[in-house]
From Swiss-Prot:
PANTHER family per UniProt: GMP SYNTHASE [GLUTAMINE-HYDROLYZING], GMP SYNTHASE-RELATED
Catalytic activity: XMP + L-glutamine + ATP + H2O = GMP + L-glutamate + AMP + diphosphate + 2 H(+)
Species of provenance: Bacteroides fragilis (strain ATCC 25285 / DSM 2151 / CCUG 4856 / JCM 11019 / LMG 10263 / NCTC 9343 / Onslow / VPI 2553 / EN-2)
Upper classification of the organism: Bacteria, Pseudomonadati, Bacteroidota, Bacteroidia, Bacteroidales
SUPFAM superfamilies: Adenine nucleotide alpha hydrolases-like, Class I glutamine amidotransferase-like, GMP synthetase C-terminal dimerisation domain
Subunit and interaction comment: Homodimer.
Glutamine amidotransferase type-1 domain sequence ranges: 4-193
Protein's name according to its UniProt entry: GMP synthase [glutamine-hydrolyzing]
Ligand binding (ATP): 221-227
Length: 507
């Protein structure tokens, strides 16, 4: 059985980041709601308590009885988690005189404490809290301080229980990964045996046992998640897997043909469906973004359902759902707040059992598994692309001509990123067709044509993103190529908005 660390989620925006950092230590972990600890699970080696947007003294704050956990497992409380343990054991937590957000330095810490093994003097940590621990219980010992925070970390004397006021999981905490390694490996004793190869071996065995000789259908999008899921399933059940790739007419230029070729080279059994006329007809005159998404979502379900029913004896629907989808689909109280983005509604409509072979993986782990499976690098490193495709990058109504313009402009931009060695430095990139026209001069003639916006961002998880600071020379070359080569465009802009407050996609 796979050993694991349990992360109790109290609602922090960085809880998933804790999970990713633990996984980077080649250790398996699971994120569960703060009140859903898996009692009786003998594979649990330690527990991490996340941060939270709440104050521990609020009536509405999330509270949990740790008596069955404390003493049985090592515990590390982060921010709210640290405050919660101090407060519920008789310590004091109060609003900070000055909220501390951003970089701080550990001015002193107990170098002989196992949590700080290998941590450098004055190391930078990341603070993000409005409350602070002002007094700790008698059996708690302060083990680190910053200039502004006297109790930056503590340990319960005689117990494997620690609390840190800062966020070791955040990139800006310079030795944060080392601290997590000290806890996960040295304290909890995890073996660090979680790897792409071990995941593939165990998952293929599980899929064979789960599916037997049953037939499975999977909807492909051309993206990383569904592609890796397909190759993994193909390794487990071979010809019993049938994949369906629907072209709604709003994919990137030549994408349907190129991706179908990739899938065939991977030995997948793929049915390609050109449903572009259906989608263009149903989208005619629609301008509201959410209506576009719903029309495309329903249309995909209808086409997929129709094609799947042509197959005989299918019992399972496979999806490329990944771990963040599963986490986001439940609130920390266990109620649904967001349905899976993959093929929402299909399992119920088709009366099929659901198979999600990647449901335990983060995005970066999906890519690592893809490499281990021998998939081509250009398929593994593809940028995220919205399910509705270019429909949400065309502001206003959608026509085949607008899609043609956007496909041509987007192709120049993306190929330019590849040619200049910039593609892998960017999390996501694309072109937006704006609902405006502008005056220009080409040759000796006045033009009145469309404007487009280039969008490229850097990110690690899409929760936050910064606009990519691409070279001016590159932007100038792309702008010139688009204006000269794409009929109908005479102006190019560059979107320099970050998320937040803007989103990555315009619609």
């Amino acid at each position: 059985m796979q050993e694991k660390i349990i992360i109790l989620d109290f609602g922090s925006q960085t809880t998933q980041l804790i999970g990713r950092r633990v996984r980077e230590l080649d250790t398996y972990c699971e994120i569960v709601p703060y009140n859903k600890f898996p009692k009786g699970d003998e594979t649990v080696k330690g527990v991490i308590l996340s941060g939270s947007p709440f104050s521990v003294y609020d009536e509405s704050a999330f509270k949990v009885d740790l008596s069955e956990i404390r003493g049985k497992y090592p515990i590390l409380g982060i921010c709210y988690g640290a405050q919660f343990m101090a407060y519920t054991n008789g310590g004091k937590v109060e609003p900070a005189g000055t909220r501390e957000y951003g970089r701080a330095h550990l001015t002193s810490f107990c170098k002989d404490n196992v949590l700080f093994k290998g941590v450098r003097e004055g190391t930078q940590v990341w603070m993000s809290h409005g409350d602070t621990i002002t007094a700790i219980p008698e059996n708690f010992k302060t083990i680190a301080s910053t200039d502004k925070v006297a109790i930056a970390a503590y340990q319960v004397e005689g117990e494997q229980v620690w609390g840190v006021q800062f966020h070791p999981e955040v990139f800006h905490s310079e030795d944060g990964t080392q601290m997590l390694r000290n806890f996960v490996v040295d304290v909890c004793g995890c073996k660090q045996d979680w790897s792409p190869a071990s995941f593939i071996e165990s998952t293929v065995a599980e899929l064979k046992a789960q599916l037997g000789d049953d037939k499975v259908v999977l909807g492909l999008s051309g993206g990383v998640d569904s592609s890796v899921a397909a190759v993994l399933l193909n390794r487990a059940i071979g010809k019993n897997l049938t994949c369906i790739f629907v072209d709604h007419g709003m994919l990137r230029k030549n994408e349907f043909k190129n991706v179908m070729h990739d899938y065939e080279c991977l030995g997948l059994n793929v049915i390609g469906v050109d449903a572009s006329e259906k989608f263009f007809s149903e989208l005619e005159g629609v301008t509201e973004p959410e209506r576009k998404r719903k029309i495309i979502g329903k249309g995909f379900i209808d086409v997929f359902d129709e094609e799947a029913h042509k197959l005989k004896d299918v019992k399972w629907l496979a999806q490329g759902t990944i771990y963040p989808d599963c986490i986001e689909s439940l609130s920390i109280t266990g109620t649904v707040i967001k349905s899976h983005h993959n093929v929402g509604g299909l399992p119920e409509k088709m009366n099929l059992k659901l198979c999600e072979p990647l449901r335990l993986l983060f995005k970066d782990e999906v890519r690592r598994v893809g490499r281990e499976l021998g998939m081509p690098e250009h398929l593994i490193t593809r940028h995220p692309f919205p399910g509705p495709g270019l429909a949400v990058r065309i502001l206003g109504d959608i026509t085949p001509e607008k899609v043609r313009i956007l496909q041509d402009a987007d192709d120049i931009f993306i190929q330019g990123l590849r040619d200049w060695g910039l593609y892998d430095q960017v999390w996501q990139a694309g072109v937006i067709l704006l609902p405006v026209q502008s005056v220009g001069v080409m040759g000796d003639e006045r033009t009145y044509e469309r404007a487009v916006a280039l969008r490229a961002v850097t990110s690690t998880d899409a929760m936050t993103a910064d606009w990519a600071h691409l070279p001016y020379e590159f932007l100038g070359k792309v702008s010139n190529d688009i204006i000269n080569k794409v009929k109908g465009v005479n102006r190019v802009t560059y979107d320099i908005s970050s998320k937040p407050p803007a989103t990555i996609e315009w619609e």
